[in-house]
Amino acid sequence: MKLKLILAVAMLAFSLPSQAERIKDIANVQGVRNNQLIGYGLVVGLPGTGEKTRYTEQTFTTMLKNFGINLPDNFRPKIKNVAVVAVHADMPAFIKPGQELDVTVSSLGEAKSLRGGTLLQTFLKGVDGNVYAIAQGSLVVSGFSADGLDGSKVIQNTPTVGRIPNGAIVERSVATPFSTGDYLTFNLRRSDFSTAQRMADAINDLLGPDMARPLDATSVQVSAPRDVSQRVSFLATLENIEVEPADESAKVIVNSRTGTIVVGQNVKLLPAAVTHGGLTVTIAEATQVSQPNALANGQTTVTSNSTINASESNRRMFMFNPGTTLDELVRAVNLVGAAPSDVLAILEALKVAGALHGELIII
């Protein structure tokens, strides 16, 4: 069986020159980022698909107390239309109080489905413990589940997770370092010394010498005006400057679970000879029942018959010549009929032998 490689190769794989990209496409402004919010709440109005756990009852009782309704200590409410949930959202930079956020609601307990439910007012907090938004509204759930009387069950997608578009109102904004200090710092999404230097050079070519300087393989510091309005137009100019990213380092990335192999253009192989054989062992179990005659005083016995077969496939040896490229590597492994798991073993062996020039990453 020939190997079918799923090769996700970047533009470099076809030996094309690197294309210039805008700074906004390859870097972020330091401090300008999303902030994660999370809360704990109740979803009500479920059509019998909620939960009856102790902490659900406790949360429900606490909510009633907040409304001035006190239940007896020994009273356990029988609720099947309520579920405790985790609510989370991402709060973008510069968002202001009164604006809205999309929220995701996920069941924390044994609720069968959140379909048809409504989230009650839930405080969304940041990592500092402060409340930044309040969420409430009807859930949109794409999944569903149905149970039959005979115990059969049908589940489509994930019925215990839903979303509320514009379901949270921002109550507090988050300060960013954008409007303070004498500098703006860009952080590359993919660290590379050459790209950082090229970015600084491109900015200096437009704004003048010594306006930008690379701090390391990730960060480029740029002198910026103090006035906020000038800083906005200044950044609008910077983020549209085009930079030609440096070539990626030679890498081979293998997903051992799916068999996906990603090979960069710069991967080279030194001379090496490879052969890979496979031993297959098959064990088949057959069960036989020996039933005695009805008039005989015997017992029913169950016996097992095992059949074991072993076979070893023959593989041809192939050789990598100096400077073997990606295309030649793919053709070679296809020629010997290697499976994805075999390719992983071959690549690991080549790396250990020093014949693979590139970083081997297994995910």
UniProtKB/Swiss-Prot annotation:
Residue runs in coiled coils: none
Cellular component, GO, one term: outer membrane-bounded periplasmic space
GO molecular function: structural molecule activity
UniProtKB keywords: Bacterial flagellum, Periplasm, Signal
One Pfam entry name: FlgI
Chain ranges passing through the membrane: none
Main location: periplasm
A Gene Ontology BP annotation from the UniProt entry: bacterial-type flagellum-dependent cell motility
Location in the cell: Periplasm; Bacterial flagellum basal body
Signal peptide interval: 1-20
Subunit structure, interactors included: The basal body constitutes a major portion of the flagellar organelle and consists of four rings (L,P,S, and M) mounted on a central rod.
Job description of the protein: Assembles around the rod to form the L-ring and probably protects the motor/basal body from shearing forces during rotation.
NCBIfam families named among the record's database cross-references: PRK05303.1
UniProt similarity note: Belongs to the FlgI family.
Protein name according to UniProt: Flagellar P-ring protein
Organism (species): Shewanella sp. (strain MR-7)
